[in-house]
């Protein structure tokens, strides 16, 4: 073969997509076009080869994910097998000849007895259909369900490990991809097992069609005697069934091995795993040897056979037991050296100990970081808080907040605590409580006006204010249907918890942006904006970048538009070194987003304004120091100003269209700091953050 031919073959081998497309087209043509017996023999041999190779792959892979394409392969092989059955059926009925392999298989299995051949075929088919396929199908179904149910918990666990520094960003990304791939694979396997099941049913139908059709054609068209026709076509039919069912059985075994495989960190091939785990229990082998010896003593049983087996199993168990004992003794000796306090290995350890424990390993307290986000719930609420529903709600909240703010919030740890008050829950950040509430058993939380509940005749109990300026009422679950019909908003216990948590996360969002998170966000952008990332890191240090993001998120400004934020850092970073002022310039670069957010997509922005005199008063109270600037108004002026704000704005919860407060850029951050304790939900904007298209709707002017 010349080099040009080899190069051509290499090119074909590289284009696996074309090879698959050609194979699928060939499968379709096999169903339509008649094939000569020689070609059928080749295709049947190929079918068997594929089945054997797939079985070997299933045995030698370390994890099911290493063969994640198996569901698709299962579909292709099933189609190929069915197309082959159609081709052989056509040749059996038309020419009474389906190739040498089919005839040999049939003649060998039938062995001169049609009934025996059919019984053997049925046994193989039933074993495949009822035993292997049915079991594999159930395992795949349960694995798919459990994998999907466990996904939120696994995701939160990965986030928690990443926050705690146990794993880095790349490893977290790999683990998430593995979880997603695992869920998709078992979900696909759940459906793909139906192919194997259907293939077994099709095989049963085809054998009866071939026998009946063959005998009918042989008697009516070919002039054969009924017995002769039955003998001829039964051999061919059973042979056809066997050449189809044997590869199908191998494929079913392959599927069973893959879906029942339990993978772990130290997994190797299936044979090694089984061998390791079997020889790890020498006592079981010793007991098994004794039982085999007892079987050999039963009258009528083949004594010699059972004695030989008992000897082999018993000796194997004894040898493994001796080996295990020697290993245990060696480990104990090593442990005694390590913990002796005077041995050399202990002196070389890095563990720092003191007092009586000096030189002993395992006595030092392990380093443990605080949990970033923790919810303690009264243990009596464990049944009321459905795990799956709560997981779904928590994942939904984290996803929604990420889409709104762009903050990668950590995993949420839920702990049921027996030492809490009835129905009480506490939300903690870094294990410090920041919010608490109460869940009332048998009740739903309703956030509607009293008049609406009274109008519907629904009794209620006043609940505590979960959030400032938001009343809540408890309504018995027996009125749930009436609330639904009246389209009133209500919350289950899981929804109450996640709703309260979402507000807490929004309020403390800046606490979840640190240097590690900033680095993570930059890494996410590096693929598409490499030059921008390089330039911004040259101009703005990572610590300053982190502080800017914290200030933006702290005022409910999303950092998802990282490109615009980084572009603004590059533009203003060299001109302005003060982080606070640099943040103001970046906010002005985000004015289109800010206007859209607070105008609710309209061109009209309801706003309160500060009088010029008030702005000058605040401006004169700003003090500059080496540590930064701050507002130092006299207490009387501060109280007077806050009183005017209260009079002008009033109760924010009673205002339908949420307003903003607009002031000059140089005092905006000081005004925000001044009013946030009482009006946290009132955004403070500067005139530079307004687009030309926005129209201000003045609601009032605040004067002294």
Swiss-Prot record:
Swiss-Prot/TrEMBL keywords: Cell inner membrane, Cell membrane, Membrane, Plasmid, Protein transport, Transmembrane, Transmembrane helix, Transport, Virulence
For this entry, the protein name equals: Low calcium response locus protein D
Q: Which gene encodes it?
A: lcrD
Q: InterPro entries, per this entry?
A: FHIPEP_1, FHIPEP_3, FHIPEP_4, FHIPEP_CS, T3SS_FHIPEP, T3SS_HrcV
User: Topology relative to the membrane, per the entry?
Assistant: Multi-pass membrane protein
TM stretches of this protein: 18-35, 42-61, 108-132, 200-220, 235-259, 278-297, 304-320
The UniProt entry's GO CC annotations, sorted and at most eight, read:
plasma membrane
Job of this protein: Could be involved in the secretion of the yop virulence proteins.
Q: Which domain of life is it from?
A: Bacteria
Q: Which organism is it from?
A: Yersinia pestis
